[in-house]
Every structure is written in C-alpha cells, then in structure tokens.
C-alpha cells in the first residue's frame, strides 16, 4: 500500500487532534476547536502530560509539555518511536535514491544550495558532507568567560522536535538516523550547539548542522554526557549505545537534518510551558493581593466581565472570584469598610481592580501562541518535501519559522505585561500610603527605624521590570537579508525564542519575589490583628477602671466614652503607632485624647464639677494606659513569635492557603524582620529554586482545585 496515498486524510486527522476528519480545508475549524475549554483545564492537562514517563513519537501528536519534559530531563522520561512510521520514512528515503539514480534533478540532492542552486553534481553523498561542513559556522567561545553554547534543554527539545518532523516520511532520511538521535536523547547525550548563528529560515541551519556533525563523526563535534562530561563523537556514540559506525549521509539526508525549525520551536515549547503556568500564577497572586490589601471583591463580579466578552478576561475574573469567595480577609475587610466608608477610596486602584482586564488578553495571547507552536512542532518544515504518492519533490518554504518568531514576540510582550502588573501591585503593597495599614516596606520589627523590610527588594523588582520591558520589543522587525539575498526575508524564530526565554527567566525572578512579599503581608495582617486586639482589650480595661466611676464609687459620665474609644482603635492603622503606642506624637494617643475632650465639651455643665468632670479623668486614663499598654503589646508580640497568638492566622481559612503553606512550611521561610539575620534575597532564592524545579505547580493548582470552570452565578 502507498504510505502517502491518504495524505490529505492524515492532515485532517492531525489538525483535528486525532479525531475523525471533517470538511476543514483551511484548518481554521481545527485551530478554533483546539481553543475550546478553559485555559486552566489546558494547563492541568499540560502538567499531567509533562509527568508521564514515555513520549510516543509518531509525527502528529507531539505537545509542548512533552517537549518540555524531554528538554528538562528531570522526570526520567524516555522517547519511543512509532514503528508505524518506519515504512513511510523508508519510502521517502528510497524515493530520493531512486530519483537520483534515474537522473532526476532535485534541490539539495543534485544541486547546490540557496543562491548557488544553479550548480550541479552527481556526488550526492559528498554534497551532504560539504553541507554540514560549511554550516558548522558557529562560535562557542571555549576557554573564555563568554558562554556561546545553546542551553542543553533547548538542544534536547530541538532533537525531539526534529525526530517528530522526520518521522512523517516527507524528508528522505533513513529511519536508523532517527533511532540514533533517539538513543542520544534517552541516554542523556546532548550535542553542543552554538547559541547564535541562525535566522530560522532556511530553518535553523547552523545549530542543526552540529547535530549532523556528531552523527557523521566530524572531528570538531562535541557532546555533553549525563554527568556533564565532554565527549567527542566516538565517545558519544559509545555512551548512547549506537552500535553502528558514524553515518555516511546519503543524498538529501544532510538537508533533512538541518533544513527545519526545531531549534526555535523546541525552545519555544519549553518557554510556553512555563509561560502558561506563570499566567495562572499571576491570576492567583492578584487574588491574594486583593486579600491582603483589603480590596473590594466587586471587581470580579461576572456581569462586568460578561459584558466585555473576552474569554481570557472572563476566566481570569472567575478564578480570582473563586479564591476570594468565602475568604476570611474579604469578610473582615467588608466589616472595616462598613465602619468607615471614607477611610479608603470607593474603588481600588487599577493594579487590583482591573487585573482581570489586564491579564485576560495576555492569557489569550499565550494560549494562542501555544497552539501555534504545537502546530509547528507537528509540521513538516523542510525543503524540498518528498511526495512519494505523486512521485515528485516539492520545492517550497516550510522552513520559514514565522509562526515561531511571531508567537514568541507576542508571548514576550504578554510576559512583560504580566511583569508590569506584578510590579505595580508590589509597589502598592510596600507603600504605606496605598496599602491600607500595612507598614512601610512591609517592615515587621519593633523598631521601624532599624528595619527597612522590602526596600531593597523593591529596587530589585524595578530592575527586573525595566529589563523585562526592554525585552518586550519585537525581534521579528529586525530581519536582515541573508545568503546572497536568497534568504531576503527570514523569521528570526530562535532569536525571538531566546529573548522570550530570557523574559520568562526574569518573570520567574519577579514571581517568587512578589509571593514572598505577599506572604510577609499575610503574616503582618495576622500580627496586626493580634496587636490591635491587644490594644483594644487594654484600652477597654483601662477605660473601665479609670472612666466608669468617680472618687466615691458613683457612676461617672465618662463611662460613655468607652465605645467611642474602641472605635478609634478599630479605625486607626495599627502599624502607624505600634512601635511606641503611647507616644503623644503618634495618632493613637492623640485621637483617644480627642474623644475624651469631645465628650468633655459635650458634658459642659458637669465639667464645672470636679467629681463629674471628664476632662479631669484624661490624665489618669493616659497615665494608666502608658503603664499597661507597652507591656501588653510586647506580650502579644512574643506570643506571636512563639506561635501562640490569641487569634489564629486568617490565611488558613482561605483558598489561597496552599501557596502560603508551601512557601512557609515546605520551604521553611519566615516573616522577615530587621531583628533577624535572614535577608529577603535568601528567601526569594529558595522560592525561585523551587519554582525552577516545578515544585510550585501542585500548591498553585490546589488553590483553584475546587473551581468548576465557571463564574459564580449572578444573584
């Protein structure tokens, strides 16, 4: 049976995720179908797939999560080739040999390359050997401080994607070569590729030529073994268990190895796997931000977002709504807003209130880019293509990596915008003019003059954000005409993927920094609640003792002051006075005195009598408060530090608790103060390392594990 006779039907199956083909000649319906369902469900599927122990390659169903898993090589994942693909691969390889023997003139088989394709030769094998030699044009910078080697994760991703492309049987290469690359992957032998030197059209020629160089035993080829040791080609073959000698490339095989987009699309796959998770993390962190900032949850109401129509926005709002629904912080904030509606603005600032509108389009961009790259890694992207069924070689341009360049430019812009929102939220969080009662810089010490909290961290965040915004600039607009004006437009796909990888790395610095600050804010809210409760109890106790009765035991008019005194404690920001609660220059004592003075003025007739004068009681009240309150506040602090707080931490009753628990308990971080040695950078580093190891994924998804994929019903 002709292996390519049903090519059109196969394309339909591929585009429709393996489902039965339908009338969709332009593939738009399949592209739209792939975007059905929630982004969160898709991320969950990606994580699940990432953790599977085996990747079965057949050319049509490779996913970015599988590429990321093979690239990372931290899950013990192995690659297995589909035997069903062997016949198709062999058919195209045989066709090339037959066509050459029959005198057929084919690009890259009997002709020169690119702008010099007018040249002709009958030495097909020698031509492939020369192709690999002249494309080995990269610089590694060995022996210098400059590292010009492509990260091994990107190389492994490229190897996997290239195998997948060649398995489809349109490229004219032997199956044995694909098996050899698979053995290199499964034995963790990674060829050394140059970091720079490709314009991803005609494919990633220069870096891919170094994989071909290793397979053919070029003396300049190098690989890295499982333990980081440097291997030459012979040692690499032995370590991978490749029994044969080096490959003598047949006609077209060199071109099949180098003329494609897998380095750009492979790295793009790794980048997008992380970008999707970071997008979900940004949604959850925005909800936690609303909690610790005493935000008004009205900004997540479904009607607002339904009227805007954008699915990314609707989902982002629904996820935040789910986390805030039933949150103990939201309930407490509602009571505070009822006590004094004028204490804070009617509406929260944009970084909080419009976070769904901001993040929604970014999620859409990342999701669409993911699907675009997923199509690319399942594409046949070299030239010429061998159509065995029609007995011809098709000369086209599938090596043009524009889907990669455009998707990566767009993703990088989205990543930069996520970082911008994080920085805006972080800036509000550490600023006591905006953070609704938290201390400046989130300082937690007894003496704020010797604790500057997250000040250095805010400077670092500004640095991260600035670099990230610079990286948001497009790469694809900087195309240069190459190769004697034959490659006069080119995608710059790998360059864009590299820059997007840099952007993701920076966002991975910002995210743990921000989450550490949010955990600090959570702890400060807990401390604040306990300190305020102590102040309130102490003021009540002193008021009862000094203001209730007169010198002869009779009820005194000042007994009516207690309720208003406690209102002051409720309204006043605790950290505005708690380092010296009885200071006459701090707002607590000033406003408590003001209450007593106002009651005295309202009690004008009784003020003439020393026995009923409220004014005469002020000194006694203040002196006793000064004696008692500092001791009680210190006692409350000590109890908090010993884990014996009178009031438990509200976070334990919230859906955001799994992230807090992960940061504090699993990673062993703590509330930072100037009284301790540990620095903010140490804590951020712990979380950054854990994020790079993928450890944040499970607690993140646990926060929204109960979400049913829909907004709360309108009522």
From Swiss-Prot:
The active site is at 107 (proton donor/acceptor). Its main location: cytoplasm. (E)-cinnamate binds at residues 259, 347, 353, 383, 455, 483, 486. It is found in: Cytoplasm. Its EC number is 4.3.1.24. Contains an active site 4-methylidene-imidazol-5-one (MIO), which is formed autocatalytically by cyclization and dehydration of residues Ala-Ser-Gly. It holds the Pfam family Lyase_aromatic. There is a cross-link at residues 201-203 (5-imidazolinone (Ala-Gly)). One of its GO terms (molecular function) is phenylalanine ammonia-lyase activity. The keyword Manganese does not apply. Keywords: Cytoplasm, Lyase, Phenylalanine catabolism, Phenylpropanoid metabolism. GO terms for cellular component: cytoplasm. Disulfide bonds: none annotated. PROSITE patterns: PAL_HISTIDASE. The modification 2,3-didehydroalanine (Ser) is found at residue 202. One of its GO terms (biological process) is cinnamic acid biosynthetic process. It catalyses: L-phenylalanine = (E)-cinnamate + NH4(+). It comes from the Eukaryota. Pathway: Phenylpropanoid metabolism; trans-cinnamate biosynthesis; trans-cinnamate from L-phenylalanine: step 1/1. Homotetramer. PANTHER family: HISTIDINE AMMONIA-LYASE. This is a key enzyme of plant metabolism catalyzing the first reaction in the biosynthesis from L-phenylalanine of a wide variety of natural products based on the phenylpropane skeleton. Belongs to the PAL/histidase family. This is Phenylalanine ammonia-lyase. It comes from Stylosanthes humilis (Townsville stylo).
């Amino acid at each position: 049976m002709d292996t390519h006779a049903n090519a059109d039907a196969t394309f339909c199956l591929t585009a429709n995720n393996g489902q039965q083909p339908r009338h969709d000649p332009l593939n738009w319906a399949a592209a739209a179908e792939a975007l059905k369902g929630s982004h969160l469900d898709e991320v969950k599927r990606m994580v699940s797939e990432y953790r599977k122990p085996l990747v079965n390659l057949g050319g049509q169903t490779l996913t970015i999560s599988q590429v990321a898993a093979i690239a990372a090589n931290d899950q013990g994942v192995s690659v297995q080739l589909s035997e069903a693909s062997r016949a198709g691969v062999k058919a195209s390889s045989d066709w090339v040999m037959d066509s050459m023997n029959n005198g057929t003139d084919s690009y890259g088989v009997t002709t020169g390359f690119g702008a010099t394709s007018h040249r002709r030769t009958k030495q097909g094998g020698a031509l492939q050997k020369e192709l690999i030699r002249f494309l080995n044009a990269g610089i590694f910078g060995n022996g210098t401080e400059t590292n010009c080697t492509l990260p091994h994760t990107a190389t492994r991703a490229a190897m996997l994607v290239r195998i997948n492309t060649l398995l489809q049987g349109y490229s004219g290469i032997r199956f044995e070569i694909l098996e050899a690359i698979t053995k290199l992957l499964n034995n963790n032998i990674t060829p050394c590729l140059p970091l720079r030197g490709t314009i991803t059209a005609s494919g990633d020629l220069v870096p891919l030529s170094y994989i071909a160089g290793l397979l053919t035993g070029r003396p300049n080829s190098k690989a890295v073994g499982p333990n980081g040791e440097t291997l030459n080609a012979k040692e690499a073959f032995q370590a991978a268990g490749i029994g044969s000698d080096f490959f003598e490339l047949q006609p077209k095989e060199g071109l099949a190895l180098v003329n494609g987009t897998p380095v750009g699309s492979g790295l793009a796959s790794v980048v997008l796997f992380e970008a999707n998770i970071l997008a979900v993390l940004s949604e959850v962190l925005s909800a936690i931000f609303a909690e610790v900032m005493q935000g008004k949850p009205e900004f997540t109401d479904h009607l607002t977002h339904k009227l805007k129509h954008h699915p990314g926005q609707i989902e982002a709002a629904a996820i935040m709504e789910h986390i805030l629904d039933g949150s103990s912080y939201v309930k407490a904030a509602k009571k505070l807003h009822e006590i004094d509606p004028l204490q804070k603005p009617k509406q929260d600032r944009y970084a909080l209130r419009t976070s769904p509108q901001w993040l929604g389009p970014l999620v859409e961009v990342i999701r669409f880019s993911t699907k675009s790259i997923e199509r690319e890694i399942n594409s046949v992207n070299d030239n010429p293509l061998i159509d065995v069924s029609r007995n011809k070689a098709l000369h086209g341009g599938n090596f043009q990596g524009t889907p990669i360049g455009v998707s990566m430019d767009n993703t990088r812009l989205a990543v930069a915008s996520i970082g911008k929102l994080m920085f805006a939220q972080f800036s509000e969080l550490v600023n006591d003019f905006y953070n609704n009662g938290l201390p400046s810089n989130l300082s937690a010490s007894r003496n704020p003059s010797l604790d500057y909290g997250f000040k250095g961290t805010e400077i670092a965040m500004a640095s991260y954000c600035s670099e990230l915004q610079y990286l948001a600039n497009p790469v694809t607009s900087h195309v240069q005409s190459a190769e004697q004006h034959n490659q006069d437009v080119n995608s710059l796909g790998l360059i864009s993927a590299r820059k997007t990888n840099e952007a993701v790395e920076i966002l991975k610095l910002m995210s743990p920094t921000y989450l550490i600050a949010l955990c600090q804010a959570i702890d400060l809210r807990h401390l604040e609640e306990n300190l305020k409760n102590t102040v309130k109890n102490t003021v009540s106790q002193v008021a009862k003792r000094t203001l209730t009765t007169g010198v002869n035991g009779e009820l005194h008019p000042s007994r009516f002051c207690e309720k208003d005194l406690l209102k002051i404690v409720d309204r006043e920001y605790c950290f505005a006075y708690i380092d010296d609660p009885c200071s006459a220059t701090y707002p607590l004592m000033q406003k408590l005195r003001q209450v007593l003075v106002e009651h005295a003025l309202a009690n004008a007739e009784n003020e003439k009598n020393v026995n009923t004068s409220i004014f005469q009681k002020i000194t006694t009240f203040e002196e006793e408060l000064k004696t008692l309150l500092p001791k009680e506040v210190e006692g409350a602090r000590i109890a908090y530090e010993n884990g014996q707080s009178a009031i438990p931490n509200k976070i334990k009753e919230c859906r955001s608790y799994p992230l807090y628990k992960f940061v504090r308990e699993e990673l062993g971080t703590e509330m930072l103060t100037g009284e301790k040695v540990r620095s903010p950078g140490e804590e951020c580093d712990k979380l950054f390392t854990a994020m790079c190891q993928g450890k944040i994924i499970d607690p993140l998804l646990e926060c929204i594990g109960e979400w049913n994929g829909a907004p709360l019903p309108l009522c």
